[in-house]
Amino acid sequence: MTRRVRLGVDTGGTFTDVVAVHEDTGDLAVTKTPSTPSDPAVGFMTGLHKVLDTLGLGGDAVSGVSHGTTVATNRLLEGRVENLGFVTNDGYEFLLEIARQSVPDGYGNSYFWVKPDRIVPVDRVRTVRGRLAVDGSEIHPFDLDQATEQARWFRDRGIDTIGVCFLHSYVDDSHERAMRDVLAREHPGATVSISSEVLREYREYERAVTTLVDAAVKPDLRRYVATIATRLSQLAVGQEGGGSPPGTHPGPSTAGTTPSVRSESPLPFYVMKSNGGVLSAGEVVDQPISTVLSGPAAGALGAAVVAAAAGFSQVVTLDGGGTSTDVTVVVDGQPALTTEGTIGAFPCKVPMIDVVTVGAGGGSIAWLSPEGTLKVGPRSAAADPGPVCYARGGVEPTVTDAHVVLGRIPPHLLGGEVPLDVASAAGAIDALASELGLTRDACAAGVLEVSAWNQANALRQVTVERGLDVRDFTMVTFGGSGSLLACRLVDVLGLDGVLVPVNPGNLSAYGLLTVDVRNDYVQTAVARASTLDPAVVRAGYDALTERAAEALAREGFPSDRRVFERTADLRYFGQAYEVRVAVPEGAVTEELLASVADAFHDEHRALYGYDNRADPRQEVEWVSLRVSGIGPLRTPSVPEASVGGGARSASTGSRKVYFDDWVDADLFDRRLLGAGDEITGPAVVEEFSSTLPLHPGFTARVDAYGNLVVRRCAS
């Protein structure tokens, strides 16, 4: 059979979402299956077989698989970074302890702040003599004997995951490579990451932590990707059986090695990266740090693609899950990027889509603060035991319980697969209401109001920090709980409207199929604009472009299918932060450098409200050069929807729903709605993986692509 179906598989903490796209027709098929945190490969393969069974196809029909995984993220968020060691310069053993000497926002009095545990305790930090100057020249030679001694120290104590970060190795990596060679000789079973390969950028604290995060997640990610790659290879040739039953393992893997990842396979397998691109499994195992936010990145990209097709180039996205809500901003069809992200308590300076996360998901717990006020989140009931209405042992009221009590979601989820216990949810809300002195309805409505404001604050944060006005944006909501508070957010934020895509609960999996192969490269090269030599800048970009080209060649992209994008980090001399600006194509000349400086002034004003263009004393300083290498993949177009026959044909009845009061709300099956159909609230639009409560005074119109466009009525 000709391979014509591409699959996107997004593994979340609760569900694994799968989207299948036929490359010729653009037809979509979607499904969900419970995730299997103890062995994520089981849920992955079960979901894959489920969608293929729906289509009546076998593995020989699959042309490629793109995957978003939480393996790396979960290891960090759960604090599972044990058995990790660190090697740095002699005299810098307290680099991680000192960190940035800063206290997080919200702790005005530092006496109340408890410093979190460092990623590596100081007793597992070893130092080696040897020192490079800021320009890469050698001040003291690398001490091979001491390096050997330290490698044996790690080996004798069974510390087999090690990060190496030496000062100024972003300029000259010879000392770090020498340390890796010593570790390979003396401790051959160790997994090693060196900072000059993970992050070739200055600021040693962030570079060290990013390198250690890379090392910490590398063993798990390698084993996981190797297992999936082996199963996909078997599937492609018809040797793989059905999805493994729960509790079983899909096959053996070898710690620290990835033979099945590196081997040739008839089925291309890509893994989503945090920067908005994908990378083949064989390459991504050497860049595990790049996958830490792959799930939220895929959702933001999928939302950007759907919004662009619908005619919206500027949107904010809201991905509502069970534990949290992720928001980001899309300008001119591109999600915003950052290198200032954090994963849990750990700074990660690799490029990633800028996502703000707030603990306001469907499972977020409502509670009474010591001050007597109602709070929602960040603590969550998660999937186990889950909200009270799941009847799995949960006793604390959650956002989902409030929705159930107010009739805003049906008494079942996933098309009836998950029945909900409305009475138990009401009991949990009643208990909280009695503490607050409120009625059940007022308490449940209050829980949703607090949750809506938590989400609104995150949306303001992601826009205002960039000098943007959230009122200029349309919001795209997706995820299982993403659309539940859409109408309230329109009022709170003054939004123009909301776009609810087709299959919103599977949009992250769809987003996996809309992206290209992408690698990012950086080189710190600090110089003031007045002394900047175009030849030096040209040489720097040429070296980065060569590295990007080599990586694309390994991915199988010929020279005529490689795209390169240049950017630079600039600042005013004396500042401690940079602004990234695009560097146009073409020869690096004085004129081009001047145009980049002009763009920096404009961007600085947009972000901070001022620039120093007219003040010659405020000199522009170049800090880092960046190149992104992009290999375009075939991506699906957004299919158009069939014309509807009127919203009444999709009506399934009515029920009492509480908005500002109890009202009769019409119910609609979204599968039966077509382009041009329009619904006026109060109403509830239900589908397999999501629900949209449409408040009184709002309309929802189905556009040409099947999206629901929600706006407040003109009157």
Task: Name every feature range the model reports, one short phrase each.
Residues T31-P37, G85-G91, A281-G407, C487-A527:
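Glycine-rich phosphate-binding loop of actin/hexokinase-like ATP-binding domains
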Residues M1-L84, H140-I162, E176-D181, R185-S195, ...:
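N-terminal glycine/serine-rich phosphate-binding loop of ATP-dependent small-molecule kinases
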Residues A20, L28-K32, G59-S102, L167-E176, ...:
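Short beta-strand-loop/turn "lid" adjacent to the catalytic site in phosphate-handling enzymes
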Residues T69, G163-L167, S195-E197, S274-N275, ...:
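Glycine-rich beta-strand-to-loop/alpha-helix junction loops that act as flexible
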Residues G163-T211, A215, V583-E585, W622-G645, ...:
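Terminal amphipathic helices with adjacent charged low-complexity linkers/tails
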Residues G8-T11, F15-V19, D27-V30, P34-G43, ...:
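Conserved phosphate-binding loops in N-terminal lobes of ATP-dependent enzymes
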Residues L232, P266-A309, E546-A587:
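Charge-patterned, long linear interaction tracts outside catalytic cores
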Residues R3, T11, D145-E149, W153-D156, ...:
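C-terminal, non-catalytic interaction/recognition modules in large multi-subunit enzymes and RNPs
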